[in-house]
Every structure is written in C-alpha cells, then in structure tokens.
Amino acid sequence: MSKITAVLGSALFFVVAPAMLAGLIPWSITHWEFRPPFLAVEATRLAGVALIIAGVPGVLDSFARFALEGLGTPAPIAPPRNLVVSGLYRYVRNPIYVAVVAVILGQAVLFADWRLLGYGALIWLFFHIVVIAYEEPTLRQSFGAEYESYCANVPRWLPRLTPWRAV
C-alpha cells in the first residue's frame, strides 16, 4: 500500500472508529453537560482534562505511524506491511486503544458521568477480547519472531517507564 493510500485509509478509519467511540457516543450519553463533580471536588475535573489531553495526541500519533511507517492502517481490512514499534508503541503494545479509553474516561471524570465510566470499562473489555482473540494471533502469524520479541519486551496495556528499542 502506498503512503498516500495508507494515510487516506487511516483517516477514514479514524472517523469510523476512534472518533465515534471516543467522541460521538460519549456525546450521545452526556451531551457534554457537567454534573456535580465526583467526590464533590471540582479539581477532579482536571484529571479528566489531563486524560483527554494525553489521549487525543496519542491516537493521532499512533494512526500516523501506522500509515507512514507501517504502510497500512489500523483497520483489519488494510493492515500494515511493517510492524510498528516506534513512538508510543515503544511503551505499550496497544496505544490507540489505551488512548481511546483515556479520552472516554477523561470525559467521564470531566463531566462526572458514571454511565460514561461504565461505557469506558465496556470498551476496554471489548478491546481486550479483540486483542487476545484476533490481533495478537494475526500479528504473530504476520511478523513471527519480530512480534514475539516485541511482546516479550512491551506490555499490552500498562506502559513501560522507559522506551523499548528493537535490536
């Protein structure tokens, strides 16, 4: 896949998946209306803002790496030709999923909406099942020892403190 095709495909998939999961659906649940803050502490909203600010660039950077380095998209119908192990992928194997859940949970805390916390937990569970049942077996088949080495050094969900460097 050419870089331009990968970029366009990734942009389309971004609108279909993360923008819907972390934008449209949370909006449909909360209408982005503030409720009394969690624990009756207004400062808790700052934690929500921090999660959103961390998550949005994480999704964008990871999508760009799929297109420009992987020469593919995050979508299963147009997977990357190269294993992406740079950027946030040096810290965690699933930065797009981690970032999407961070944005959802950030909105839950910002707007103090328990329903959005539940939605975020369900989305993470869905991502976990997809990763275990489909993505990891597919990546093992596609990239073999390179992916095995990556898995041995980079955690699935909780980021490493230092970046991993492939040898």
Range-by-range predicted roles:
Residues 94:
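Extended, alpha-helix-rich binding/interface surfaces that flank or overlap catalytic cores
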Residues 1-86, 98-167:
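Membrane-anchoring alpha-helices and their flanking helix-loop junctions
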Residues 89:
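Solvent-exposed interhelical
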